[in-house]
């Protein structure tokens, strides 16, 4: 009969092993395509190509290398969060100010996407600022990826809830509950940008803080939200 302490240790070890297996399988899956592209492109560079063609294929190699680097970093980050290897470092700060800061940094200078920000208060929270910034970045990156040019992304804080809403197509109802799962994509064609880890990382950060989160469709487009305080 295991004691309470032994059972907790066993469960933690089981969780770490599960995450290790899932991360290994995910790495093999996610790196297969970019590695194939790198191999094929490297073979083409071995041919006698014009300088402009060489520059093009070198750009492809750089792009795929960056994709692999991002996927590996995101998977390792998610693994550390899920296994508890990364502890929370709580400090007091204004969530409204952090959200406005991340919104301003979310778009490239030449983007035609508009942004709107509204907050009832500064909303002081005691949380891990760096991790919440990462979670907010994930919500905003997702919004940017699915907002058409000329569209709008709105960040709103009220009644203990922060929401990110973007103009664009509605999310299929059967996909809404699964959006926070690692590697899940509502578009089975995988034409969407990203590696499918951002929202999962965000949810893990929210879970660590004891926050709830969700996604829904609105009249103007999808909305992702998390509750950080009672009303």
Model-identified regions with their sequence ranges:
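Short conserved segment of the HATPase_c
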Residues: 171-185
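Short acidic helix/loop segment immediately C-terminal to the autophosphorylated histidine
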Residues: 46-52
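Conserved micro-motifs of the catalytic ATP-binding
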Residues: 83-88, 124-127
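Short alpha-helical segment of the dimerization/phosphotransfer core of two-component systems
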Residues: 63-68
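Conserved glycine-rich
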Residues: 210-211, 215
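Short helix-loop "hinge" at the ATP-lid/N-box region of the Bergerat-fold HATPase_c
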Residues: 143-144
């Amino acid at each position: 009969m295991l004691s309470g302490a032994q059972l907790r240790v066993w469960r933690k070890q089981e969780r770490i092993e599960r995450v290790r297996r899932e991360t290994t399988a995910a790495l093999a899956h996610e790196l297969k395509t970019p590695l194939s592209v790198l191999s094929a492109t490297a073979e083409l560079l071995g041919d006698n190509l014009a300088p402009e063609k060489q520059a093009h294929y070198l750009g492809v190699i750089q792009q795929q290398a960056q994709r692999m680097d991002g996927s590996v970093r995101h998977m390792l980050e998610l693994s550390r969060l899920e296994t508890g290897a990364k502890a929370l470092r709580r400090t007091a700060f204004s969530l409204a100010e952090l959200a406005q800061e991340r919104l301003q940094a979310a778009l490239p200078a030449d983007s035609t996407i508009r942004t709107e920000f509204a907050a009832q208060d500064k909303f002081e929270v005691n949380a891990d600022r760096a991790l919440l910034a990462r979670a907010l970045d994930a919500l905003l990156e997702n919004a940017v990826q699915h907002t058409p040019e000329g569209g709008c992304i709105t960040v709103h804080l009220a009644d203990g809830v922060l929401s990110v809403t973007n103009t664009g197509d509605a999310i299929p109802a059967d996909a809404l509950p699964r959006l926070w799962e690692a590697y899940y994509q509502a578009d089975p064609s995988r034409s969407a940008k990203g590696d499918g880890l951002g929202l999962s990382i965000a949810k893990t950060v929210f879970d660590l803080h004891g926050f709830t989160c969700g996604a829904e469709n609105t009249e103007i487009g999808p909305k992702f939200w998390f509750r950080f305080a009672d009303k």
